[in-house]
Amino acid sequence: MIKPHGSDELNPLFVYDTQQRHALIAEAETLPSILLNSAAAANAVMLGGGYFNPLTGYMNLADSLAVAEKMRTVDGLFFPVPIVNMTSETGIEAGSRIALRDPNMEGNPILAIMDVEAVESVSDDQITFMAEKIFRTLDENHPGVATFSSLGRTLLSGPIQVLNFSYFQADFPDTFRTAVEIRNEIAEHGWNKVVAFQTRNPMHRAHEELCRMAMEQLDADGVLIHMLLGQLKPGDIPADVRDASIRKMVEVYFPPNTVMVTGYGFDMLYAGPREAVLHAVFRQNCGCTHLIVGRDHAGVGDYYGGFDAQTIFDEEVPEGALELDVFKADHTAYSKKLNKVVMMRDVPDHSMDDFVLLSGTAVREMLGKGIAPPPEFSRPEVAKILSDYYQTLDA
């Protein structure tokens, strides 16, 4: 199986030993504590599950600035975005041991324990520098920029011990998986070549066929459909609805034992190219050999070029930095001429009128009225689940 990023073995920061974990939970109740923001809590969950291997905790300011600038820590570890705990809390001292409380669960239970190695102030200029490097914009209308700029100006760095996986395990018991669990499941399947498909949206015909194309062209053993379960921007479809629609699609339209449907506990960054590279890092940690990167991967609005998330792998990711390979996909759509889903670049003789194309707004309006999109665009079983959801909103 492909090695994890940056090490020979996966190093999840969740405390798996039950006795030790219970002792730490008891200790945490005696420690000074801070309430994390959602971004720092999501980072803790990802660190706990081994997704951000080989990191051992939150980055310090020097590493955060270096990673933002050139995707490498001060010591040379390749990593695409800073993994930080930035807060507005005061009174924390370097050398202290603190409990980190979960902002996303009732009662704010303890999520992790942190050994604080450094407490550093982050200037507005440094926030601006990092935001521009990560998101390629400083527009506060960009949801990632808005979130990053509001995180606080005190950066806490140091190793953490993760004690639970927040709400993800309880709310999505059949879907949430750690990188450790996914690697184990891939091994149990006996898969050697595995293609990952990232999604924060429901999957329509084009997405379904894209997974199939990648699997066939790469002669892969299986596909990992890996959905984001954390916070999105307003208007995006909730995870439970996406989960149900994707599972129905896989059940009806894919051969048995060729697809794993799982999810991960992270908030969407909308960082386009940089987030695509982060997706590659943690899919390698999951045991995947390939990641599908399509048009406007991890993007939002018009902030990124259609294929910036592909070209970053050629132009900015050093050779050998990742073992995982990228499957570069063009925009896919149903061809009326060929009666199948195709990549647009593969059919230069087609005009736009030869494809079944619908905007997201048009699809939402149809589903909200109980009208199914054309079967060339969306499977009827998927459309039914989405239509039921949209009609509850309109009601």
Regions from the language model: what does each represent?
Residues 1-395:
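Active-site cores that bind ATP or allylic diphosphates and position pyrophosphate for catalysis
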